[in-house]
Amino acid sequence: MGRLGLTEILVIVGIVILLFGGKKIPELMKGLGSGIKEFKNAAKDDQPAPAKKQEEEQK
């Protein structure tokens, strides 16, 4: 019951196009993509840090 079907997705896309217009959507997607990229980079930078601390503690 919590899944979106094809009809619901098409309705959502139609509403987004009506609200933002065709010219604004590429700008929104570009901003969303850059935000996701920054988030992934930040997450990747945080992961190696604990491994380095453990190596320093063992020395």
UniProtKB/Swiss-Prot annotation:
Keywords: Cell inner membrane, Cell membrane, Membrane, Protein transport, Translocation, Transmembrane, Transmembrane helix, Transport. Gene3D superfamilies: 1.20.5.3310. The keyword Membrane applies. The chain crosses the membrane at residues 1-21. GO terms for biological process: protein transport by the Tat complex. It is a single-pass membrane protein. GO terms for cellular component: TAT protein transport complex. One of its GO terms (molecular function) is protein transmembrane transporter activity. It comes from the Bacteria. It is found in: Cell inner membrane. Pfam families: TatA_B_E. Belongs to the TatA/E family. Part of the twin-arginine translocation (Tat) system that transports large folded proteins containing a characteristic twin-arginine motif in their signal peptide across membranes. TatA could form the protein-conducting channel of the Tat system. Forms a complex with TatC. This is Sec-independent protein translocase protein TatA. It comes from Flavobacterium johnsoniae (strain ATCC 17061 / DSM 2064 / JCM 8514 / BCRC 14874 / CCUG 350202 / NBRC 14942 / NCIMB 11054 / UW101) (Cytophaga johnsonae).
